Amino acid sequence: MSRAVGIDLGTTNSVVSVLEGGEPTVIANAEGGRTTPSVVAFSKSGEVLVGEIAKRQAVNNIDRTIASVKRHMGTDWNVAIDDKKYTAQEISARILMKLKNDAESYLGEKVTDAVVTVPAYFNDAQRQATKEAGEIAGLNVLRIVNEPTAAALAYGLDKGKEDELILVFDLGGGTFDVSLLEVGKDEDNFSTIQVRSTAGDNHLGGDDWDQRVVNYLLNQLKVKGIDLSKDKIALQRLREAAEQAKKELSSSTSTNVSLQYLSVTPDGPVHLDEQLTRAKFQDLTKDLLDRTKKPFQDVIKEAGIKLSEIDHIVLVGGSTRMPAVYELVKELAGGKEPNKGVNPDEVVAVGAALQAGVLKGERKDVLLIDVTPLSLGIETKGGVMTHLIERNTAIPTKRSETFTTADDNQPSVAIQVFQGEREFTRDNKPLGTFELTGIAPAPRGVPQVEVTFDIDANGIVHVSAKDKGTGKEQSMTITGGTALSKEDIDRMVKDAEEHAAEDKARREATDTRNTAEQLAYSVDKLIADNADKLPEEVKTEVKADVDALKKALEGTDDAAVKTAFEKLQASQSKLGEAIYAQAGSPDGATGPAGAESAAGSEGAKADEDIVDAEIVDEDEKK
């Protein structure tokens, strides 16, 4: 049986690990390093360079060197080299191929199976892109695992038998996650690791700290009348110097940034010699650090625990070596010291190797239960986001809900899938759309369309829709799409909290419109079906209220809709009274129940389990 490796595919650095005798070992690359820079370059001779060698030549080959490609995963980003366009998946695949080759050299055998990690807050498109990159690299991706979960797996296996809570604070080169996990062992030493909650920011990491230093140095030069903001070579040298300064300031209180012959101007060569203190560095990046606070607090709140209940805090990612990060985590945790016995650069890959061992049967003493980071649902009438799976639900998971049509004889429904926390789909992330056709002609509200969401262990979404009447089914695996822009996912949760009242009012107005439309339709039908039994004056009065409601529904005044709706609700009872009186006795009539609230007369026979929401035919919307 071939060996499986664990890969931490990072924004700035990547690591590969393997189980040897059941224990994880980090594999050194061909250059002797335990971490490989996530940098790919195309030399002018056509050679593809990856890792340290690509990073070293970046200054002299800027336009043909790609770094931090992880930030583009799941988007339509591409880079043109020698008239050929490369996607983010293809560039990432080059990094994975390098790690694969290094592992094969170390093990002396072919490597095809791998567990690859992603940030916990990666959306569906980003996870799919990561899996595709693995496939391009010739890897069979056994599982996509969240980075904080992998870290907890590596850290938590040697813990005691008591259930313990581990908080993982993962600040990498380009992404940030916080996760709370529960780790426990039974009497047989079988470990269960379950994610309780997770939060994060897909566009926050060490690269942003570096950029602040670059901006500061550029401004210092501007004061002297020198603008290098368009000088690509100078910018690359500044980026490298900024990264080095950041690292040095983790162990010393000041550093000197000295770059001779940084550029050449008409006045001569430009030299940079700037002193940067840790205090100044922390001042330049304070707002970046502040952005880590809310996800931390959200995780604690969603898990419903007290800070004192956290047993261990694990720092992951090279960026957590910054003293300000360590102190902030300690402060947020109520004074509890984060664990210093974990290598933040390697722990994720070690956890990935352990999970690979579990999947290959090398380790049989671990069960890993992860969660989906964002709620999933479909658009129903009025643009409402109807959730089928809530955020922080354990995966894999499956959930079905039955919906109905919005129009008479509607031949098809468009199933529009969204991810996010807001009440309306326009405020959430669209994942994809597919159409269920061939619905048998029937009055609206009669067809039953069962929509099923299935999230696999990789966190990848599969959606299907089935017409219960005809048995016709349509399904899709969510792929492609555009990834979330900076802070998008975090914004979804934040916006949901900030706009809760506004969303509630809009939701109520939409619900009123939907109910009002159903009432007008039902009362109209009741009048038509009983035209010969109703006195003219009753018909005229109620019909006028129906027409008034229909007119209000054509407008945008929600208050007018509510008023007209309430008026029709009151007057429609006269229809039942008139029909009852016409029948002359209870034996000859359907009774008051036969003319109950018209809003219920048409739909009451429907299955009680059917959700009171309608899927709109896209053609009607156009």
Swiss-Prot record:
UniProt biased composition (Basic and acidic residues): 496-511
Organism: Arthrobacter sp. (strain FB24)
Region of interest: Disordered: 496-515, 579-622
Pfam family, one: HSP70
Biased segments, Low complexity type: 588-603
Function, in words: Acts as a chaperone.
Name by which UniProt lists this protein: Chaperone protein DnaK
Residues the record lists as Phosphothreonine modifications: T175
Family membership noted in the UniProt record: Belongs to the heat shock protein 70 family.
Matches recorded under NCBIfam families: PRK00290.1, prok_dnaK
InterPro entries associated with the record: ATPase_NBD (IPR043129), Chaperone_DnaK (IPR012725), Heat_shock_70_CS (IPR018181), HSP70_C_sf (IPR029048), HSP70_peptide-bd_sf (IPR029047), Hsp_70_fam (IPR013126)
Expression triggers: By stress conditions e.g. heat shock.
Lineage, uppermost ranks: Bacteria, Bacillati, Actinomycetota, Actinomycetes, Micrococcales
Compositional bias ranges of the Acidic residues kind: 609-622
Keyword annotations: ATP-binding, Chaperone, Nucleotide-binding, Phosphoprotein, Stress response
PANTHER family tied to this protein: HEAT SHOCK PROTEIN 70KDA (PTHR19375)
Molecular-function annotations in GO: ATP binding; ATP-dependent protein folding chaperone; unfolded protein binding
